[in-house]
């Protein structure tokens, strides 16, 4: 005893959660575009992601292998099992999808792209001769075979049996749409009277084929709700009546298997709205108006991002019928929304120091701008402007325009001196060593054997010296994709990006406060335990955190 559509309903809910950013625990960065997702979904779909998400919550993808628009389609396929391409499934789009699928080790998507590229009729243009098996191509059979009224009546009978199933759900592959569209176009060009007689059958499918093929600016894949039992079953009588019908319907079992094994689905509402009215004249006029209205829109918005597309009224209605429509940005808006926000003492330092206000000495005493990741509900998509300038919040359609815009900012705006998560513990230890060195030089209580060759500062161990020497390096090959700040190590850059994205995986069991770094949590726990491991060698003062000791040591070294 089971629910037939339980899996699809569950996947639909997960996709809606992804669109709203609910319970998303991983960020995928593609150039400057950020996509939120769930680790368990990615791990179940991709071997590549499965090996990465165990170690980090932030994943940077190779921009030579995948771009933001292609990865959005990949992510939609992972969450829905459907491909709704804004390029009408062109060769270029499938090649890009195949490259990305192979790179991310999505074997089902890669196999689907290979089959589609193999089936594409454009590959036959390079072969003017007939195929090796002696049969003419499907396109040639469709365009050269005349259609008789008897054939149309058979199609009309089969259409009646299918209407009831379409009212429930209907999944059509791209091959079905192409075959039916071509079949009806041939019928109208060869026999106008035939199209009138069979308007309920073939012309209905012509409207269906036109409507679906023109629907390049697709809506939300997260809102389409499809039952697995809705795969249309073709009538054997209609499939065997004529050569033209066999040309259209012989492909259906194959495409149905392709749809079942490698989902490439379309929602039920799209088929319901495209059913022709009984009146033939009214049907013709409405179809002409629909063509005139949709043709410029589909051309004007070709290549536009799916979530920001203003769909025709008919398509919007279909999506509402198919499922609950998400607000403004339906395609699982995977991009992260940011808000520039000024706070005192950084993301976590201000909270920690407020907890320890009785003993903590506020070393900075300054306002620093931090970029705070805001995940409050669902916000409108950025549309074409995938590349966002974090300091001012402006979006740009290309990375070149973003880079040109970033150069207009002053250095102070982009490289804000803030108490970064990466500065401690190693860099703070270096500063503490420097201050202690000055103190010991005055009091003569300790000797340092390891000296810096650049500034002659000395340290008591080589590890601290190496960390100090990195501050003199001029090359910083790892930039932050969000603010542009440069780092000498990849791990340091990754930890820095957590401050932008608001990823705080470490939580205090006592009070629930969350932190981006493990050592921050360890320091915070001392507030509850009362431990003070950092002691001043001059006056014996003890502190819970090392930065408080640094502030205290400055008092001893200051001229006053």
From Swiss-Prot:
Species name: Danio rerio (Zebrafish)
SMART domains: BTB, ZnF_C2H2
Principal location listed in the UniProt entry: nucleus
The protein's name: Hypermethylated in cancer 2 protein
GO cellular component: nucleus
Zinc finger (C2H2-type) residue numbers: 387-409, 450-472, 478-500, 506-528, 534-556
PROSITE patterns listed in its UniProt record: BTB, ZINC_FINGER_C2H2_1, ZINC_FINGER_C2H2_2
GO biological process assignments: regulation of transcription by RNA polymerase II
UniProt function note: Transcriptional repressor.
């Amino acid at each position: 005893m089971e629910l037939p559509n339980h899996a699809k309903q569950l996947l639909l809910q997960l996709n809606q959660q992804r669109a709203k950013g609910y319970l998303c625990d991983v960020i995928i960065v593609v150039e400057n575009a950020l996509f939120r997702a769930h680790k368990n979904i990615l791990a179940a779909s991709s071997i590549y992601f499965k090996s990465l998400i165990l170690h980090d919550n932030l994943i940077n993808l190779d921009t030579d292998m995948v771009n933001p628009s292609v990865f959005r389609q990949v992510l939609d396929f992972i969450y829905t099992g459907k491909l709704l391409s804004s390029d009408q499934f062109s060769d270029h789009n499938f090649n890009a999808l195949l490259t990305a699928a192979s790179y991310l080790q999505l074997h089902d998507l890669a196999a689907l792209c290979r089959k589609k590229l193999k089936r594409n009729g454009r590959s036959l243009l390079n072969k003017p001769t007939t195929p090796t098996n002696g049969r003419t191509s499907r396109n040639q059979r469709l365009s050269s075979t005349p259609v008789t009224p008897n054939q149309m009546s058979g199609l009309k009978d089969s259409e009646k049996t299918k209407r009831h199933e379409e009212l429930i759900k209907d999944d059509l592959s791209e091959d079905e749409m192409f075959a039916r569209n071509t079949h009806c176009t041939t019928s109208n060009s060869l026999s106008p009277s035939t199209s009138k007689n069979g308007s309920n059958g073939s012309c209905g499918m012509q409207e269906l084929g036109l409507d679906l093929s023109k629907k390049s600016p697709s809506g939300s894949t997260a809102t389409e709700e499809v039952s697995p039992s809705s795969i249309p079953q073709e009538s054997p009588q209609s499939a065997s009546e004529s050569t033209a019908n066999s040309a259209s319907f012989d492909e259906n079992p194959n495409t149905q298997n392709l749809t079942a094994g490698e989902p490439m689905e379309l929602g039920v509402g799209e088929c319901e709205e495209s059913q022709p009215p009984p009146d033939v004249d009214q049907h013709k006029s409405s179809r002409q108006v629909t063509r005139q209205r949709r043709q410029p829109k589909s051309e004007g918005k070709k290549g536009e991002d799916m979530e920001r597309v203003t769909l025709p009224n008919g398509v919007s209605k279909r999506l509402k019928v198919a499922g609950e429509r998400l607000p403004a940005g339906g395609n699982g808006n995977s991009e992260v929304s940011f808000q520039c926000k000024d706070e005192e003492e950084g993301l976590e330092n201000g909270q920690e120091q407020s907890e320890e206000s009785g003993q903590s000495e506020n070393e900075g005493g300054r306002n620093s701008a931090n970029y705070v990741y805001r995940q409050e509900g669902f916000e409108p998509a950025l549309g074409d402007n995938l590349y966002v300038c974090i300091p001012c919040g402006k979006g740009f359609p290309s990375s070149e325009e973003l880079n040109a815009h970033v150069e207009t900012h002053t250095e102070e705006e982009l490289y804000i001196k803030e108490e970064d998560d990466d500065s401690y513990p190693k860099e703070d230890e270096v500063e503490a060593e420097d201050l202690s060195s000055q103190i010991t030089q005055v009091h003569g209580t300790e000797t340092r054997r390891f000296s810096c060759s650049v500034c002659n500062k000395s340290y008591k161990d080589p590890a601290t010296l190496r960390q100090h020497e990195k501050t003199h390096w001029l090359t910083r090959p790892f930039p932050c994709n969000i603010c542009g700040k440069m780092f000498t190590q990849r791990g340091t850059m990754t930890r820095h990006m957590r401050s932008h994205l608001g990823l705080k995986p470490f939580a205090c069991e006592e009070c629930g406060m969350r932190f981006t770094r493990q050592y921050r949590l360890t320091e915070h726990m001392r507030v509850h335990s009362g431990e003070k491991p950092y002691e001043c060698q001059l006056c014996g003062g003890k502190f819970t955190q090392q930065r408080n000791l640094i502030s205290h040591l400055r008092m001893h070294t200051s001229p006053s």
